[in-house]
UniProtKB/Swiss-Prot annotation:
This is Platelet-derived growth factor subunit B. CDD domains: PDGF. One of its GO terms (molecular function) is protein heterodimerization activity. Expressed in a distinct subpopulation of smooth muscle cells in injured arteries. The lineage of its organism: Eukaryota, Metazoa, Chordata, Craniata, Vertebrata. It is found in: Secreted.
Length: 225
């Protein structure tokens, strides 16, 4: 669990965590609980002793045999547990699924082998909630896969190339969140008033064709005098 997430969880359950603590964590490199203890200048011996006294009080309050056995098991588990170490921001091996869309989007009647490969990606947590582990150097790596098509109920093997993205270096970068733009109702109305509105009227005109008819033949008649 990242340290900042743990502090937010504790703050939600009990007293609020002061912002000064987040600022202290952002300016130092904390890799273990000892580093955190030295940074906060707090001795954990008294806390461990108080925890042991609390366990002993609970042991005597109930049934002595069952409570004492549970207390011994809890003390044994605490002694055997190793100290937690922060997951540093660095490259790690992850599994990348090769989908069929990366090879051919027009055809779905084929299989890809291998269906997944290993890539190097940045992961880990940073000491401040305002920074994230991101890649600072990236390399594109082409790999060759098999495209298995089914033609007339028989497999046909073809070769295809897929480009993978590997992360070579990582660092904790500041996360820039875009601020939402809030507009008042009056501003939107003024913007609409300033914007010229043009209306286009389209008229449909029907052209009437003359009726089809036979050509009449006119006979020339001489004028009688």
């Amino acid at each position: 669990l990242p340290l900042c997430c743990y502090l937010r969880l504790v703050s939600a359950e009990g007293d609020p965590i002061p912002e000064e603590l987040y600022e202290m964590l952002s300016d130092h490199s904390i890799r273990s609980f000892d580093d955190l203890q030295r940074l906060l200048h707090r001795d954990s011996v008294d806390e461990d002793g108080a925890e042991l006294d609390l366990n002993m009080t609970r042991a005597h309050s109930g049934v002595e045999s069952e409570s004492s056995s549970r207390g011994r098991r809890s003390l044994g588990s605490l002694a055997a547990a190793e100290p937690a170490v922060i997951a540093e921001c660095k490259t790690r091996t992850e599994v990348f699924q090769i989908s069929r869309n990366l090879i051919d989007r027009t055809n779905a009647n084929f299989l890809v082998w291998p269906p997944c490969v290993e890539v190097q990606r940045c992961s880990g947590c940073c000491n401040n909630r305002n920074v994230q582990c991101r890649a600072s150097q990236v390399q594109m790596r082409p790999v060759q896969v098999r495209k298995i098509e089914i033609v007339r109920k028989k497999p046909v093997f073809k070769k295809a190339t897929v480009t993978l993205e590997d992360h070579l270096a990582c660092k904790c970068e500041t996360v820039v969140t875009p601020r939402p733009v809030t507009r008042s109702p009056g501003t939107s109305r003024e913007h609409r008033a300033k914007t010229p509105q043009t209306r286009v009227t389209v008229r449909t005109v029907r052209i009437r064709r003359p009726p089809k008819g036979k050509h009449r033949k006119f006979k020339h008649t001489h004028d009688k005098k």
